Curated annotation (Swiss-Prot):
Function: Protease subunit of a proteasome-like degradation complex believed to be a general protein degrading machinery.
Stretch forming the signal peptide: none
Gene Ontology BP terms: proteolysis involved in protein catabolic process
Name of the protein in question: ATP-dependent protease subunit HslV
Gene: hslV
PROSITE patterns in the cross-refs: PROTEASOME_BETA_2
UniProt-annotated catalytic positions: T12
Record: residues binding Na(+): A167, C170, T173
GO cellular component terms attached to this protein's record: HslUV protease complex; proteasome core complex
Keywords assigned: Allosteric enzyme, Cytoplasm, Hydrolase, Metal-binding, Protease, Sodium, Threonine protease
Protein's UniProt keywords contain Protease: yes
EC number: 3.4.25.2
Length: 182
């Protein structure tokens, strides 16, 4: 079987949002290979930097963990400077022959900033503080934007509702959520 005829990995929805001084990253637990669900309880959201930074990753698992390790190293080199650490990681990701082949995206956030990191060298800060990445990311993003201004809904409630909407639309997203907050 040639590499191009192998089924591709799918199965991540990551959502990051801010409301009322809180930041939340939520991720579903599904990993699929082609049309087959391989795992339903993967943990794609983590706290790093001594618990002061949230990370959610989408893409090939080994690639995502490689990038997570690299981000942690950059954070050790630039403590308390999430944006700088992300820019340094993006530079490496873009220029290093090994890293530029990695297929993953990351949503990262601390108490002050939320960022998307891509393999194209992008470090993006959304103007509304809401990020959606992965196969169901756009569904979760749209749902979160619709819910964000509703009084009485806190950041975690919005994240859970938006992720449930994404899980109801995207076949590569399940309702088994991990939610971390600061």
């Amino acid at each position: 079987m040639s590499e191009s005829s192998l089924p591709s990995w799918h199965g991540t929805t990551i959502l990051c949002l801010r409301k009322d001084g809180r930041v939340v990253i939520a991720g579903d637990g599904q990993v699929s290979l082609g049309a087959t669900v391989i795992k339903g309880n993967a943990r794609k959201v983590r706290k790093v930097g001594g618990g002061s930074i949230l990370v959610g990753f989408a893409g090939a698992t080994a690639d995502a963990f490689t990038l997570l390790e690299r981000l942690e190293a950059k954070l050790e080199k630039h403590p308390g400077q999430l944006t700088r650490a992300c820019v340094e990681l993006a530079k490496d990701w873009r220029t290093d022959r090994y890293l530029r082949r990695l297929e993953a995206m990351m949503a990262v956030a601390d108490k002050d900033v939320s960022l998307v990191l891509t393999g194209q060298g992008d470090v993006l800060e959304p103007e509304d503080g809401i990020i959606g990445i992965g196969s169901g990311g756009n569904y979760a993003l749209a749902a979160a934007r619709a819910l964000i201004d509703i009084d009485g809904l806190d950041a975690e409630t919005i994240a859970r509702k938006a992720m449930a909407i994404a899980a109801g639309i995207c076949v590569y997203t399940n309702g088994n959520m991990i939610v971390e907050s600061l």
